[in-house]
Amino acid sequence: MTYSLRIADIPVSERPRERLISVGAKNLSNAELLAILLATGQGKGKLSAVGLGQHILNELSKYRRDPLDVLRDIHPQELTAIHGIGPAKATTILAAIELGKRAFQRRPTEKMVIDSPDTAAAILGHELMYQSQERFAVILLDVKNQLIALKVITIGTATETLVHPREIFREVVKQSATKLIIAHNHPTGSLVPSQDDILLTEQLLQGATYLAIPLLDHLILGNGNFQSLRQITDLWEKYPQED
């Protein structure tokens, strides 16, 4: 596909919208998907919509990160700084990104059963995934693993959040929970637990054992994925929980 051509000059079978209908969205390039949102082109060299979409990706690659990672958290002013992108195009892109985030973030419902790391991570996504600051949250459950509440305990900086076991167990007692799952996000996208993460988990497991309120897991969320500390550490063998 020639990026300098107008969409009208491109054979119908190669136009982004027509290709999406014929082969499906997942088979379109990132530039083609952006072109559908942009609707029209221009910018330097009077680029087509596809060309302008590719130009956006090229500009974002200057951040030395995957352009889609940059696009996920981009501000309107950063988009409009790209030649050929005005407020209308920028807001259309940002609205599409936000809609995509919401579509893949499952909101918790009352009495929902949380019986696996996958289910827990799914309901935590809305509060923890794709955040620019570290957040620490707790899922509070009843004896049947049914959801009582999901609470964000603290919001920190881009690299750390400070939380004390006392704050977590205060919420457990307040909500009359009998089990809990803790979680926090890493804005960098890394799912590797830090030494502080391990230490806090140990402290909470000890406290949970003492109070006879099982801590089922500690999840780390980032970049659309998650990690379960229960699955990758031996902490639950050292501090068994009656779950």
Swiss-Prot record:
Short sequence motif named JAMM motif, residue ranges: 184-197
InterPro entries: MPN, RadC_JAB, UPF0758, UPF0758_N
Disulfide partners: none
Any one biological process term the GO annotation gives: proteolysis
UniProt GO MF annotations: metal ion binding; metallopeptidase activity
Residues annotated as domain MPN: 113-235
Highest rank taxon of the organism: Bacteria
Keywords: Hydrolase, Metal-binding, Metalloprotease, Protease, Zinc
Binding locations of Zn(2+): 184, 186, 197
NCBIfam families: PRK00024.1 (NF000642), radc (TIGR00608)
Family in the record: Belongs to the UPF0758 family.
Protein name as it appears in the record: UPF0758 protein MAE_44350
Native species: Microcystis aeruginosa (strain NIES-843 / IAM M-2473)
